[in-house]
Amino acid sequence: MEKLVATIPKSARDEIRVALTEFTTKDTVHQMVSARVFFEDGPEHRPGRNGINVKVTLLPALIEALQAAEREARAAGLLPSQDQAAA
């Protein structure tokens, strides 16, 4: 199973794909979330080496960590403040 959830442009040739996936070991099915960089290869995009796969149960903690990183980036002036982003 693979369900593409989002595609985020990274550059003119690359994109980040976020998907729900699963893989099976001997007797266990593991539900995963994947964020992987895909690169343009002719008319298609192919998966690159860069990315992350984590158990779907870790998704809330990962989101919390990314939100903390966003807050820190805004506080450091690396991203516009929420007020500026809304305008």
PLM feature spans:
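A structural detector for beta-sheet-dominated domains
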Residues: 9, 19-21, 57
